[in-house]
Amino acid sequence: MSTDKITFLLNWQPTPYHIPIFLAQTKGYFKEQGLDMAILEPTNPSDVTELIGSGKVDMGLKAMIHTLAAKARGFPVTSVASLLDEPFTGVLYLKGSGITEDFQSLKGKKIGYVGEFGKIQIDELTKHYGMKPEDYTAVRCGMNVAKYIIEGKIDAGIGIECMQQVELEEYLAKQGRPASDAKMLRIDKLACLGCCCFCTVLYICNDEFLKKNPEKVRKFLKAIKKATDYVLADPVKAWKEYIDFKPQLNNDLSYKQYQRCYAYFSSSLYNVHRDWKKVTGYGKRLAILPPDYVSNYTNEYLSWPEPEEVSDPLEAQRLMAIHQEKCRQEGTFKRLALPA
């Protein structure tokens, strides 16, 4: 049975959007496929692509921009599927901090970022808006961006809408302030990207492992698809099962984050070709990818039909923003139905 083992590294400690992975384990979906899974948590999220690329771990999770950069830096990894599609990502701040929708209001402020690519993104934006990197103070926060904003260690920081923004909203609610006082300058809008796909969370593989174990990867993805279908069909029941296994997530904050992640879960798991093209171009613009870089993703290990891509991605993003705001106000589980 040792040959059926897969080591899988999360992109951080267990979060609400890791639910398909853990339910595939607890509900026996991996076992049905003859797989013995070892699900690991990183000490440092910045090490994930290096550990997978060096072959110390077989598979794991990472955002699209990091997956692209990893291979460019000599860590051979490939995305084989999507977990969380295009979560809104941007510079988070609180109303009353002196920051406005004008990017130049960040001048003289302390801005937090998760890892080095966040710093590169902000530096590129400062040039675009007539500023210099010296016009702000960069603070590396890891995954503690919301915490640092709350504690006053930074004025703003890069985060995603369904995670760090919800954390800020919960803090505001406890202070008797409206949740809408948590604001975001979306990077896709600031950088004229047309999508938030650079932070799409992906299932990635070590290239050598993928080459030697194609059937094992197919089986893994079948189990993940079954778990994802289960989550999307009955999110409340799925959550109860998840927190029974991960009781540290049994709190209001995690549940609200889960509600906001719900619309972002990829139902098909397919890598979106248009998104990869855009983010590869963005990576070249940021100079983290060489001009001749070829995107490192594949859909060949997914054994069900590929859905059509949305015809108008900008309209889809606009509708998603409205949808997520409604979800925040109503606290419900809803998927966005896009017009044909």
Curated annotation (Swiss-Prot):
Listed result of changing N11A: Unable to sustain growth in thiamine-free medium
Protein residues bound to pyridoxal 5'-phosphate: G115, E116, F117, G118
Enzyme Commission (EC) number: 2.-.-.-
EC class: transferase
One example GO MF annotation: iron ion binding
Any one biological process term the GO annotation gives: thiamine biosynthetic process
Record PTM N6-(pyridoxal phosphate)lysine, positions in chain: K62
Key word Cell division present: no
Catalytic site positions: H66
Assembly information from the UniProt record: Homodimer.
Function: Responsible for the formation of the pyrimidine heterocycle in the thiamine biosynthesis pathway. Catalyzes the formation of hydroxymethylpyrimidine phosphate (HMP-P) from histidine and pyridoxal phosphate (PLP). The protein uses PLP and the active site histidine to form HMP-P, generating an inactive enzyme. The enzyme can only undergo a single turnover, which suggests it is a suicide enzyme.
Family as reported in the entry's similarity comment: Belongs to the NMT1/THI5 family.
Name by which UniProt lists this protein: 4-amino-5-hydroxymethyl-2-methylpyrimidine phosphate synthase THI5
Organism of derivation: Saccharomyces cerevisiae (strain ATCC 204508 / S288c) (Baker's yeast)
Gene that encodes the chain: THI5
